[in-house]
């Protein structure tokens, strides 16, 4: 049951109320501001869980991210330094860093958000609307539409009791084709006073084979060298 205070009809929540509840649920504005970097370590499961990669993701304000997946001595990397994205794809036979296209970088820019899509949405230039409740695997979640400055649209589903994100459905145009990516979030754990999802399952909406990230360790505000986010010079 949704809390009576935020029932449908005239007592429906406003966007500002939901965002405020989301910030409070994450640990509060002060704790969020104090969280300057995150290092998430765990495993990445692909191919319906048959293949397991060692997983590391590092995020640093104001908008840097680096994600690594390692298997049999090879490490794939995707990174964004706040301006441009790059990748190393050894599993596709490409061991030199390559610049990523503007379309490919969009998902990295969103990954880089330590706070998620709702916090500081006005400052980010987003447009946010509350669309009522919608069922998410049996939970009557609050559905919030976020139109980002780059044109991407994310539907953010908030748990009605805890006000944390449980699903984000993002729609974007990538290389001329429309795509929908669904990400389910759960198993929140606290780091430096902020709740962080440690179970992340994502893939194209409706696809049977989604990749799953299980985080075993969350480290907050540790030393992070800015160099790791910048594209190294490709070897000639």
What are the residue ranges of the model-derived segments?
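Short, conserved active-site entrance elements at the starts or edges of catalytic domains
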Residues: 107-143, 164-167
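Acidic/charged, solvent-exposed loop-and-adjacent secondary-structure segments enriched in E/D, K/R, S/T
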Residues: 86-115
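Hydrophobic h-region of N-terminal signal peptides that target proteins for export
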Residues: 1-7
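N-terminal mature ectodomain segment of secretory-pathway/periplasmic proteins
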Residues: 16-93, 123-135
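Intrinsically disordered, low-complexity boundary segments flanking structured domains
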Residues: 24-31, 113-118, 202
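Gly/Pro-enriched, hydrophobic low-complexity segments
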Residues: 7, 74, 137-233
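Short amphipathic beta-strand/extended segments with alternating polar/hydrophobic composition
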Residues: 53-58, 78-82, 96-105, 158, ...
């Amino acid at each position: 049951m949704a809390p009576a205070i935020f029932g449908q009809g005239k007592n429906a929540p406003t966007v500002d109320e939901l965002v405020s509840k989301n910030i409070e649920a994450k640990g509060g504005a002060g704790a969020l501001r104090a969280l300057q970097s995150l290092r998430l370590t765990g495993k990445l499961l692909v191919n319906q869980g048959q293949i397991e990669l060692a997983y590391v993701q590092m995020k640093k304000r104001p908008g840097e991210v680096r994600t690594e997946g390692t298997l049999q001595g090879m490490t794939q990397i995707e990174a964004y330094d706040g301006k441009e994205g790059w990748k190393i794809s050894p599993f596709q036979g490409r061991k030199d860093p390559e610049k990523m296209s503007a379309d490919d970088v969009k998902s990295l820019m969103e990954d880089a958000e330590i706070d998620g899509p709702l916090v500081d949405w006005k400052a980010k230039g987003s447009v946010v609307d509350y669309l009522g409740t919608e069922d998410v695997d049996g939970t009557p979640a609050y559905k919030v539409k976020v139109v980002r400055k780059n044109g991407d649209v994310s539907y953010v589903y908030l748990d009605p009791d805890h006000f944390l994100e449980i699903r984000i459905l993002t729609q974007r145009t990538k290389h001329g084709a429309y795509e929908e990516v669904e990400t389910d979030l759960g198993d929140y754990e606290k780091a430096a006073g902020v709740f962080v999802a440690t179970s992340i399952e994502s893939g194209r909406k409706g696809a049977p084979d989604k990749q799953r990230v299980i985080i075993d360790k969350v480290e907050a505000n540790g030393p992070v060298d800015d160099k790791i986010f910048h594209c190294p010079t490709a070897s000639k």
